[in-house]
Amino acid sequence: MKILAIGGCGSMGRYAMRSIQNYSAIEEIIIADINKETAEVFADSLNHKVSAIRLDVNDASALKQAMEDIDIVVNTCGPYFKFGAPILSAAISSGCNYIDICDDWEPTIDMMKLDAKAKSAGVSATIGLGASPGLTNLMALIAIRELDEVTTVYTGWDIGGTS
């Protein structure tokens, strides 16, 4: 499996790539960032399966070229109101499965409108698979399954502030 990690040397992308780099199913991880030097430094800190490329996600042809022969696009490049739908559209057009950590509701709606296009292309697209939304939603689902009745679920997270 080949993974293109767009924004893969940002804080969330770094964590994700460190976490998956040693999975046996992964043949190659390509860290894609507008700053190739930063991407190379990070890629060099990981194992031999990881390389780096310069990618400007505003360049549609470069985006499409980067997705050639890719199985999964992991998009941790924000802001999602600007980059979410265009990167997902490129992944669908390229036949790449897609995962992101989008945490904004408006681009989520825009990306959900691409569902029929993704299904038609045989592409699986998972949006909002970060900490919140993502992990918090899965934890809520686990809790819901243990209860007889649920009327409302609220999720949130603490970023280290004081109350």
Regions found by a protein language model. Give the residues of each.
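Helix N-cap at the beta1-alpha1 junction of Rossmann-like dinucleotide-binding domains, i.e.
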Residues: 10, 34-37
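Short beta-strand element of Class I
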Residues: 28-30
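Conserved Rossmann-fold cofactor-binding substructure of NAD(P)-dependent oxidoreductases
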Residues: 54-70, 76-79
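ADP-ribose/adenylate-binding Rossmann-like module
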Residues: 79, 90-108
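Rossmann-fold NAD(P)-binding glycine/threonine-rich loop
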Residues: 101-124
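Conserved anion/nucleotide-ligand pocket segment
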Residues: 130-132, 136-163
